[in-house]
C-alpha cells in the first residue's frame, strides 16, 4: 500500500469487479451474443429423409422385413432444395462452443486493462505522483502475454489436424516473415523511423560503464546481436500467428461488403478498417509521413506545422482511432463468417451426385462451432496493437497532448549510482543491485520506444501482407 497506494486499491477493486460481474455483465458476451448476430440451423434428419423420398420404417419388425437390419447412412441428392432456418446467437448457445470461456475472459480482461490505464492516466494528470509505480504498465504487459497465449492456443489447432496443409502454411510463412523481419532491421532510420538504432545506442551508452566495471564489456556486442535475433524470431512468430487470421479477415471482408451492398457508409468503414494496417505502416515511414508533412509546398495556405512532439502524439491518437474503428466493424465481419454456412450449402447444390445427410449437417454446424475461434483471430491483433500503443505512450515518455514541445524524457541515473560501492554490504544485495542496474541501463525510454514501435509496425505489416494474400487466394486460387 505504501508503494502503490491508490493504484493498488484500484487494481484490487478492478480484479474483484471483473470476477463478480463476469457472470452478469460481460463486454465479450455482449459483443457476440446480444442478439444482432444470427446463425443457421442445419436441417433435421427427417427433413432430409423426406427430400430423399425414403421414409424411415417405424418399427424394428418392419425394418427386418424390408431387409434394413444393416441400414446404410441416409444420403440425399446434392441439389436437394431445403431451407436453412436462422436463429439469434445467444449466450446459452455460445456456452457450449469451444474456447468461448477463454474468449470471454481474455476480451473482458483487455477491457478492464484499458479501464485501469485510463484511471492511472487521469491520476497522473491530476496529482502527478513521482515515486509511484505505474501499475497500468503491468496490466498492459499481462494483456500482451495473454495475447501471445491466445495466438499459441489458436495456432495449435492447425498443428493438431491430420492433414498437414495448415501446418505447412504456418511453417512456410514463419520462415518468410523471419527473412522479412531481418530485412526490416537493416532499413535506415531516414526511411523507417522505428527508433531501433537510437534505442540500441541509448542502451549501449548506459550499459557500457556498468559492464566495464565488471569486465563484461565483451558481452555488449553479444547483447545487441541477441536483441536483434530476438526481434527477428518474434517477427517470425507473429507472422505465423497472423497468417490464418489474415486469410480469414480477407474472406469475411469480401462477404461483409456483399452483405452491406445497400449500406455505403458501412462499406466505407469496412474498407477503411481493412486498410488500417497500411495507415499504420505509413505513420513510421518517414518520407511519407513526417517529411511530407514538414516539407510539403504550402503555396498561399497558412497553417501551423505540428512539432515533433505533436506529431508523435498525433501518431498515438491515430493508432487508437484505428483500433476503435476495427472494433466497430467486428459484428459485420462475424456475421459474414456465420453466413458461410448458407454459402456452403448453395455451393453444394451446384454439384452432382449424392451426399450423406450427416455431412450436410456437419457443414452447417462447423461454421457455428468455429465462431469463437474466428472472434479471437479478429480481436487478438487489435488488442495487441492497442496495448502496445498504450505502453508506447507510457514507457516511451510520450504525451497525449498535441503540444508544441515534445515531453522531456526522464533523466537517466548515473551508472555509478546503480551499483553499491559499500564493501560491507550484503553480497546478495550487491548482486541484486547490479542486476537492477543492468536492467535499468537496458530498458531506457529510447530503447522501449524502438521495441514497442517495432512490434506495432510489424504486427500491422503481417496483417496487411496476410490479408492481401488472402484476397488473392480467395479471388483466384480458391475459385480455380
From Swiss-Prot:
InterPro entries xref list: Transmembrane_161A/B
Membrane topology listed for this record: Multi-pass membrane protein
Main location: membrane
Annotated GO CC locations: membrane
Keywords: Glycoprotein, Membrane, Signal, Transmembrane, Transmembrane helix
GO biological process: cellular response to oxidative stress; cellular response to UV; negative regulation of intrinsic apoptotic signaling pathway in response to DNA damage; positive regulation of DNA repair; response to retinoic acid
Cytoplasmic side, ranges: 120-134, 188-224, 285-304, 392-450
Glycosylated sites: 34
Annotated signal sequence range: 1-28
Matches recorded under Pfam families: Tmemb_161AB (PF10268)
Record topological domains on the Extracellular side: 29-98, 156-166, 246-263, 326-370, 474-480
Annotated transmembrane regions: 99-119, 135-155, 167-187, 225-245, 264-284, 305-325, 371-391, 451-473
Compartment(s): Membrane
Domain of life per record: Eukaryota
Function, in words: May play a role in protection against oxidative stress. Overexpression leads to reduced levels of oxidant-induced DNA damage and apoptosis.
Family: Belongs to the TMEM161 family.
Designated name of the protein: Transmembrane protein 161A
Native organism: Mus musculus (Mouse)
Amino acid at each position: 500500500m505504501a508503494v502503490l497506494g491508490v493504484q493498488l486499491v484500484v487494481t484490487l477493486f478492478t480484479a474483484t469487479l471483473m470476477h463478480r460481474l463476469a457472470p452478469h455483465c460481460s463486454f465479450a458476451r455482449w459483443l457476440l451474443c446480444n442478439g444482432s448476430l444470427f446463425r443457421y440451423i442445419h436441417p433435421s434428419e427427417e427433413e432430409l429423409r423426406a427430400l430423399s423420398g425414403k421414409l424411415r420404417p417405424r418399427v424394428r419388425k418392419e425394418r427386418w422385413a424390408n431387409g434394413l437390419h444393416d441400414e446404410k447412412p441416409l444420403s440425399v441428392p446434392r441439389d436437394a432444395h431445403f431451407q436453412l432456418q436462422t436463429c439469434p446467437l445467444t449466450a446459452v448457445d455460445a456456452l457450449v462452443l469451444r474456447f468461448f470461456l477463454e474468449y470471454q475472459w481474455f476480451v473482458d480482461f483487455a477491457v478492464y486493462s484499458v479501464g485501469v490505464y485510463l484511471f492511472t492516466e487521469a491520476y497522473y494528470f491530476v496529482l502527478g505522483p513521482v515515486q509511484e509505480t505505474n501499475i497500468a504498465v503491468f496490466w498492459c504487459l499481462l494483456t500482451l502475454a495473454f495475447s501471445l497465449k491466445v495466438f499459441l492456443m489458436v495456432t495449435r489447432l492447425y498443428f493438431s489436424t491430420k492433414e498437414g496443409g495448415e501446418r505447412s502454411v504456418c511453417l512456410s510463412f514463419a520462415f518468410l516473415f523471419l527473412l522479412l523481419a531481418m530485412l526490416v532491421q537493416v532499413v535506415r532510420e531516414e526511411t523507417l523511423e522505428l527508433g531501433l538504432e537510437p534505442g540500441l545506442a541509448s542502451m549501449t551508452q548506459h550499459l557500457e560503464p556498468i559492464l566495464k566495471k565488471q569486465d563484461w564489456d565483451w558481452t555488449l556486442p553479444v547483447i545487441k546481436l541477441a536483441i536483434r535475433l530476438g526481434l527477428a524470431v518474434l517477427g517470425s512468430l507473429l507472422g505465423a500467428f497472423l497468417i490464418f487470421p489474415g486469410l480469414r479477415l480477407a474472406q469475411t471482408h469480401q462477404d461483409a461488403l456483399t452483405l452491406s451492398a445497400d449500406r455505403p457508409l458501412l462499406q466505407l468503414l469496412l474498407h477503411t478498417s481493412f486498410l488500417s494496417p497500411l495507415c499504420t505502416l505509413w505513420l513510421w515511414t518517414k518520407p511519407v509521413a513526417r517529411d511530407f508533412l514538414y516539407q510539403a509546398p504550402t503555396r498561399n495556405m497558412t497553417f501551423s506545422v505540428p512539432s515533433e512532439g505533436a506529431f508523435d502524439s498525433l501518431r498515438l491518437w491515430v493508432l487508437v482511432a484505428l483500433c476503435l474503428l476495427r472494433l466497430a466493424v467486428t459484428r459485420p465481419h462475424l456475421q459474414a463468417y456465420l453466413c458461410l454456412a448458407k454459402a456452403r450449402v448453395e455451393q453444394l447444390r451446384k454439384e452432382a451426385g449424392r451426399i450423406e445427410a450427416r455431412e450436410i449437417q456437419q457443414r452447417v454446424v462447423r461454421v457455428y462451432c468455429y465462431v469463437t475461434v474466428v472472434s479471437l483471430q479478429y480481436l487478438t491483433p487489435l488488442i495487441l496493437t492497442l496495448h502496445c500503443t498504450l505502453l508506447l505512450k507510457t514507457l516511451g515518455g510520450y504525451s497525449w497532448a498535441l503540444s508544441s514541445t515534445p515531453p522531456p524524457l526522464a533523466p537517466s541515473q548515473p551508472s555509478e549510482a546503480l551499483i553499491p560501492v559499500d564493501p560491507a554490504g550484503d553480497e546478495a544485495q550487491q548482486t541484486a543491485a547490479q542486476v537492477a542496474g543492468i536492467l535499468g541501463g537496458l530498458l531506457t525510454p529510447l530503447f522501449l520506444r524502438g521495441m514497442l514501435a517495432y512490434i506495432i509496425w510489424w504486427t500491422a505489416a503481417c496483417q496487411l501482407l496476410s490479408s492481401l494474400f488472402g484476397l488473392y487466394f480467395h479471388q483466384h486460387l480458391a475459385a480455380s
